[in-house]
Protein backbone atom coordinates (compact mmCIF):
# COMPACT_ATOMS: atom_id res chain seq x y z
CA UNK A 1 0.00 0.00 0.00
CA UNK A 2 1.24 3.40 -0.92
CA UNK A 3 1.10 6.00 1.78
CA UNK A 4 0.24 9.39 0.34
CA UNK A 5 1.61 12.40 2.06
CA UNK A 6 -0.22 15.63 1.77
CA UNK A 7 2.22 18.07 0.28
CA UNK A 8 2.04 21.48 1.77
CA UNK A 9 3.11 24.36 -0.38
CA UNK A 10 5.81 26.36 1.30
CA UNK A 11 5.17 29.90 0.22
CA UNK A 12 7.46 32.57 1.46
CA UNK A 13 6.38 36.13 1.69
CA UNK A 14 8.38 38.20 -0.76
CA UNK A 15 10.43 40.73 1.15
CA UNK A 16 10.41 44.11 -0.55
CA UNK A 17 13.74 45.88 -0.56
CA UNK A 18 14.04 49.36 0.88
CA UNK A 19 15.82 51.64 -1.56
CA UNK A 20 16.06 55.19 -0.23
CA UNK A 21 17.90 56.69 -3.19
CA UNK A 22 17.93 55.61 -6.81
CA UNK A 23 18.08 56.61 -10.45
CA UNK A 24 15.29 57.59 -12.84
CA UNK A 25 15.96 56.85 -16.50
CA UNK A 26 13.71 58.83 -18.87
CA UNK A 27 13.75 57.67 -22.48
CA UNK A 28 11.78 60.30 -24.41
CA UNK A 29 11.41 59.45 -28.09
CA UNK A 30 9.17 61.27 -30.55
CA UNK A 31 6.54 58.50 -30.29
CA UNK A 32 6.65 57.34 -26.65
CA UNK A 33 8.15 58.01 -23.22
CA UNK A 34 9.59 55.28 -20.98
CA UNK A 35 10.25 56.01 -17.28
CA UNK A 36 12.35 53.48 -15.33
CA UNK A 37 13.23 53.63 -11.62
CA UNK A 38 16.42 51.74 -10.70
CA UNK A 39 18.62 51.39 -7.64
CA UNK A 40 22.17 52.80 -7.59
CA UNK A 41 23.55 49.63 -9.22
CA UNK A 42 21.11 49.93 -12.14
CA UNK A 43 18.74 47.09 -11.21
CA UNK A 44 15.24 48.02 -12.38
CA UNK A 45 12.63 48.38 -9.63
CA UNK A 46 9.66 49.58 -11.68
CA UNK A 47 8.85 51.19 -15.00
CA UNK A 48 5.96 52.71 -16.92
CA UNK A 49 5.35 53.93 -20.46
CA UNK A 50 2.97 56.35 -22.10
CA UNK A 51 1.56 53.54 -24.23
CA UNK A 52 1.11 51.28 -21.20
CA UNK A 53 -0.78 54.04 -19.43
CA UNK A 54 -3.63 53.78 -21.91
CA UNK A 55 -2.58 56.33 -24.53
CA UNK A 56 -2.51 55.28 -28.16
CA UNK A 57 -1.50 56.89 -31.44
CA UNK A 58 -0.57 60.56 -31.44
CA UNK A 59 -1.78 61.04 -27.83
CA UNK A 60 0.98 58.66 -26.70
CA UNK A 61 3.65 61.23 -27.61
CA UNK A 62 2.20 64.12 -25.58
CA UNK A 63 3.72 65.61 -22.43
CA UNK A 64 0.57 64.71 -20.49
CA UNK A 65 0.97 61.02 -21.36
CA UNK A 66 4.56 61.15 -20.06
CA UNK A 67 3.29 62.81 -16.87
CA UNK A 68 0.75 60.02 -16.28
CA UNK A 69 3.42 57.36 -16.89
CA UNK A 70 5.72 59.06 -14.37
CA UNK A 71 2.88 59.21 -11.85
CA UNK A 72 2.31 55.45 -12.16
CA UNK A 73 5.99 54.53 -11.85
CA UNK A 74 6.51 56.95 -8.94
CA UNK A 75 3.69 55.34 -6.96
CA UNK A 76 5.44 51.96 -7.13
CA UNK A 77 8.85 53.52 -6.38
CA UNK A 78 7.47 55.10 -3.21
CA UNK A 79 6.47 51.61 -2.02
CA UNK A 80 10.19 50.77 -2.14
CA UNK A 81 10.84 53.78 0.12
CA UNK A 82 12.58 55.87 -2.51
CA UNK A 83 13.01 59.53 -1.56
CA UNK A 84 15.92 61.00 -3.54
CA UNK A 85 16.69 60.35 -7.19
CA UNK A 86 19.25 61.18 -9.85
CA UNK A 87 17.62 61.75 -13.25
CA UNK A 88 19.11 60.63 -16.57
CA UNK A 89 17.24 61.99 -19.60
CA UNK A 90 17.73 60.31 -22.96
CA UNK A 91 16.16 61.45 -26.23
CA UNK A 92 14.57 64.54 -27.81
CA UNK A 93 10.89 63.75 -27.15
CA UNK A 94 8.15 66.00 -25.81
CA UNK A 95 7.96 64.18 -22.47
CA UNK A 96 11.33 65.34 -21.13
CA UNK A 97 10.34 68.40 -19.08
CA UNK A 98 6.91 67.20 -17.96
CA UNK A 99 8.43 64.03 -16.52
CA UNK A 100 10.91 65.99 -14.38
CA UNK A 101 8.14 68.38 -13.30
CA UNK A 102 6.03 65.42 -12.20
CA UNK A 103 8.92 63.98 -10.17
CA UNK A 104 9.10 67.28 -8.26
CA UNK A 105 5.33 67.17 -7.73
CA UNK A 106 5.62 63.63 -6.32
CA UNK A 107 8.01 64.95 -3.60
CA UNK A 108 11.20 63.30 -4.80
CA UNK A 109 14.44 65.08 -3.92
CA UNK A 110 16.26 65.44 -7.25
CA UNK A 111 20.00 65.19 -6.66
CA UNK A 112 21.13 65.68 -10.27
CA UNK A 113 19.73 65.92 -13.79
CA UNK A 114 21.96 64.59 -16.57
CA UNK A 115 21.26 64.59 -20.30
CA UNK A 116 22.69 61.39 -21.80
CA UNK A 117 21.25 61.82 -25.29
CA UNK A 118 23.61 60.32 -27.84
CA UNK A 119 25.16 62.75 -30.30
CA UNK A 120 26.18 61.24 -33.65
CA UNK A 121 29.71 61.91 -34.87
CA UNK A 122 28.35 61.98 -38.44
CA UNK A 123 26.67 58.60 -38.09
CA UNK A 124 23.36 57.69 -39.73
CA UNK A 125 21.70 59.82 -42.38
CA UNK A 126 18.78 61.76 -40.83
CA UNK A 127 15.25 61.10 -42.12
CA UNK A 128 14.14 63.17 -45.09
CA UNK A 129 12.14 66.34 -44.47
CA UNK A 130 8.35 66.02 -44.44
CA UNK A 131 6.39 67.56 -47.29
CA UNK A 132 3.04 68.59 -45.89
From Swiss-Prot:
Oxidoreductase found in the keyword field: no
Family: Belongs to the universal ribosomal protein uS11 family.
Subunit structure: Part of the 30S ribosomal subunit. Interacts with proteins S7 and S18. Binds to IF-3.
Cellular-component GO terms for this entry: ribonucleoprotein complex; ribosome
Annotated source species: Legionella pneumophila subsp. pneumophila (strain Philadelphia 1 / ATCC 33152 / DSM 7513)
Chain's role: Located on the platform of the 30S subunit, it bridges several disparate RNA helices of the 16S rRNA. Forms part of the Shine-Dalgarno cleft in the 70S ribosome.
Alphabetical list of NCBIfam families matching this protein: PRK05309.1, uS11_bact
UniProt protein name: Small ribosomal subunit protein uS11
Keywords: Ribonucleoprotein, Ribosomal protein, RNA-binding, rRNA-binding
Thylakoid keyword on record: no
Domain of life per record: Bacteria
Signal peptide range: none
GO biological process, one term: translation
GO terms assigned for molecular function: rRNA binding; structural constituent of ribosome
Pfam families: Ribosomal_S11
SUPFAM superfamilies attached to this UniProt entry: Translational machinery components
Amino acid sequence: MAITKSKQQKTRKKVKRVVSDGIVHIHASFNNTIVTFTDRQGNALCWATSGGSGFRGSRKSTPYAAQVATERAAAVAKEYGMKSVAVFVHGPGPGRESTIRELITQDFKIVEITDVTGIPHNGCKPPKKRRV
